[in-house]
């Protein structure tokens, strides 16, 4: 009997699977439902396995060895473990200090002192008198007490910041036009400004006495009071600038005004400058009978002088003293006398008449112009204090200034009599910290005038409590451009600040404006003020024969009773 065998039932049939074709990338186009919402983290077969959670991820608290198991994989945080504290077991603990019985107080004091190595007559100044009592020497008590309040100076626990007064009271009818903060001004730059071109020169200069270069601490010399007149004439009262303004330039100022604006980012005290815009011309002036010409002392110090008017070390009294020292020093180091040679410029001193018989300070005035671009031509009056005869016979013009030491302990400085001869760089570095603005302005004035050298004198009080007698301890000279680089003074930035002020005023209508440094913030404000502002202050000033009012001159030798 034959049987028919069905072979089709013994072998399964082959069904062709559906292969997805991904035209836009690599891998499947759709994800099966069984693998949805399952987190995925790239891994490498070289990764360490056998851990419950990924301790090598970014949540690892071991910052020192955070790259211990690092690789290109394992950087995800899908399986990272985050420790969360269980607050159900939180409870308060009594932290009140337990009062010890009297017999246990000071029990471990001697053990602690002996462990730190401060035994009897040890270096730390601890003396043990027995019976568990340890005292400090009186010398070390004084050294320790100032350190007690160091931690209180930080944060809001320290004393409130010192509020300075404004140089001029802002009135209600003044309109604020612009506020310029120091960080923005410090980013300005106006490069490639050429050296100023001389227009005319006036005055007479005396020659420098080289014997003052040999003065040192052991060979000091008393500072003399020179009875000479020093003119501090503002821009619009200068007859030469009035004459030049008719034909040359459209911005007019003095070197002191320009230096104040160009070094404004280094100033802390308040100051102001009046600007008059007449057509396309700008005149920058200082107000009469103000402290604009006084030299600041320790303006940029961490601990500036205290505001005690009754003290000789108040900011104003120190400024008068510094101005007195500066003018007398600049005249004392010159060869004076009728028999001594003098250097005469093209024109005589424009601030004295021929019939006046007065002793005028040795000052040479150089009127120069600069082209600042965009048809802006600056005309300014610059000054030289002396002249030096070189071996080749060519004269070198000097800017002579003086730094003064008043009280090194109160000024947080260094003792000049101990450091000046051996570590003069340390003394100058300390002055750069405490008087950065004043030194920068002196440097800018020397650069603007084209001085060949900047002479700095070191003048100190004979007694720190006596502000009327001083001695010269030494001198030092620099080239203005090199000294500007040394004190990190950028002339490109200085020209940029000046050009920014000029552009702001040029955009305004004709009238009177005022630039003021905020007394407590690093901000300069530009105000639009009425045309008759400050006119009442000038009504009492004397006028010359030609009707041109001059600012009162100052005789610092006769005003010595003020300091």
From Swiss-Prot:
Location in or out of the cell: Cytoplasm
Region described as Disordered: spans on this chain: 98-167
A GO cellular component entry from the record: nucleus
Basic residues bias (residue ranges): 100-121
Keywords annotated in UniProt: Cytoplasm, Initiation factor, Phosphoprotein, Protein biosynthesis, RNA-binding
Tagged with keyword RNA-binding: yes
Residue ranges of the region described as RNA gate: 291-305
Any GO BP annotation: cap-dependent translational initiation
Highest taxon of source: Eukaryota
Phosphothreonine PTM positions: 128
GO molecular function: mRNA cap binding; translation initiation factor activity
Entry comment, domain topic: The RNA gate region regulates mRNA cap recognition to prevent promiscuous mRNA-binding before assembly of eif3d into the full eukaryotic translation initiation factor 3 (eIF-3) complex.
UniProt subunit comment: Component of the eukaryotic translation initiation factor 3 (eIF-3) complex. The eIF-3 complex interacts with pix.
Family in the record: Belongs to the eIF-3 subunit D family.
Function: mRNA cap-binding component of the eukaryotic translation initiation factor 3 (eIF-3) complex, which is involved in protein synthesis of a specialized repertoire of mRNAs and, together with other initiation factors, stimulates binding of mRNA and methionyl-tRNAi to the 40S ribosome. The eIF-3 complex specifically targets and initiates translation of a subset of mRNAs involved in cell proliferation. In the eIF-3 complex, eif3d specifically recognizes and binds the 7-methylguanosine cap of a subset of mRNAs.
Protein name: Eukaryotic translation initiation factor 3 subunit D-1
Lineage: Eukaryota, Metazoa, Ecdysozoa, Arthropoda, Hexapoda
